[in-house]
């Protein structure tokens, strides 16, 4: 069958294909699925790994993820455009994924026998989730080796902010994402360490894939001087918005940040703000390079559109997207370390360097 070309706008193009479907398609036409597929395909045509359509049915799960509470296996995922695969950015500490040995950089090939590409990330994410106690099978590509995992889903609470006092009265705080309440937990943990007499602070942002931007801004506000620039946000019309520290700092001591290639998004906002304002030195390796901000638009039918709407620049107007932030002191972990989430302190050359600089 030959179809004549008629390259018009999207509405006329869809109408053309609808007529062909109505005329020739043998099976049952599910109008809702057809509409949803058209929307997803349209948005995927933007070729942006962070912009996605969220169906009405998936919105509750999305909002639960944003607050740090959900049922699943506990991984942060990103679209890997080079391989067109879904990549594990990092597993959540203590989660089924971490316990099973899933690592940052692992590529997800299939979930319960169904293969997925980067464009299918939201579908795969929903497939991975389910009722607590049920299992999910995943096929993972690690380098050239394929591995299979069977994991039991659990109720996941993203780890709270953790902290301790190291040698020489050095405080140490780490957290794996910026979720609802992270800034308040960070402040409480710092005050707890301050009561124990810390004189300097190490903030570990390694494997922190980001999260809620406002939480990162609030933590920056605890450290920067009032009116210091935190970041610049630039929209599609080159209209610029400046985010500045609104209060006097509550943290006034030497700070070292730890970063690696899995430090992304909101973590990079915090790292860039503290580095450019001279409030912290960065130790580790270059960060991931996600320097764009998404906003969630809720539509009248209950569905949503998470859309990349702004690029951010550090206070020195340094571009981060697809570039990353260079550390002040580049320190790589030894080759003997195979799992960046489980590094023995004796092997943690990055932490050792941070301690040396914080003394």
Residue ranges and their predicted role:
Residues 1-79, 83, 103, 110-111, ...:
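Intrinsically disordered, Ser/Thr/Pro/Gly-rich linkers and terminal tails that flank
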Residues 85-92, 118:
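Short, structured beta-strand/loop micro-motifs enriched in basic residues and often containing a Trp
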Residues 89-90, 98-100, 112, 122-290, ...:
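Cleft-lining beta-strand/loop regions that shape enzyme active-site pockets
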Residues 105-107, 303:
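Structural motif
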Residues 109-110, 306:
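Hydrophobic beta-strand signal
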Residues 294-298, 305-338:
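Conserved P-loop NTPase
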């Amino acid at each position: 069958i030959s179809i004549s070309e008629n390259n018009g706008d999207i509405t006329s193009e869809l109408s053309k294909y609808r007529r062909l479907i109505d005329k020739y398609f043998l099976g049952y036409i599910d109008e809702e699925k057809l509409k949803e597929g058209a929307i997803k395909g349209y948005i995927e045509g933007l070729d942006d790994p962070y912009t996605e359509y969220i169906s009405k049915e998936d919105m509750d799960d999305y909002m639960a993820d944003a607050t740090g509470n959900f049922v699943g296996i506990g991984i942060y995922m990103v679209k890997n455009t080079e391989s067109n695969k879904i990549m594990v950015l990092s597993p959540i500490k203590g989660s089924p994924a971490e316990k099973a040995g899933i690592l940052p950089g692992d590529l997800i090939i299939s979930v319960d026998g169904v293969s997925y590409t980067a464009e299918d990330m939201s579908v795969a994410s929903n497939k991975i989730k389910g009722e607590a106690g049920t299992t999910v099978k995943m096929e993972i590509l690690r380098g050239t080796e394929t591995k299979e995992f069977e994991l039991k889903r659990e109720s996941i609470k993203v780890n709270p902010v953790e902290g301790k006092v190291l040698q020489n009265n050095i405080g140490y705080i780490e957290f794996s994402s910026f979720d609802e309440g992270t800034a308040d937990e960070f402040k409480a943990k710092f005050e707890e360490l301050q009561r124990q007499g810390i004189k300097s602070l190490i903030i570990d942002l390694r494997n922190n894939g980001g999260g809620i931007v406002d939480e990162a801004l609030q933590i920056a506000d605890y450290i920067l001087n009032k009116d210091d620039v935190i970041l610049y946000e630039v929209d599609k019309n080159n209209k610029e918005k400046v985010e500045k520290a609104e209060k006097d700092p509550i943290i006034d001591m030497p700070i070292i940040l730890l970063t690696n290639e899995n430090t992304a998004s909101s973590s990079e906002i915090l790292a860039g703000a503290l580095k450019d304002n001279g409030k912290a030195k960065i130790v580790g390796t270059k960060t991931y390079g996600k320097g764009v901000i998404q906003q969630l638009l809720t539509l009248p039918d209950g569905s949503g559109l998470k859309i990349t709407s702004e690029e951010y620049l550090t206070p020195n107007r340094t571009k981060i997207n697809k570039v990353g932030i260079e550390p002040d002191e580049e320190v790589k972990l030894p080759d003997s370390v195979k799992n960046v989430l489980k590094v023995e302190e004796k092997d943690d050359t990055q932490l050792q360097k941070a301690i040396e600089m914080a003394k």
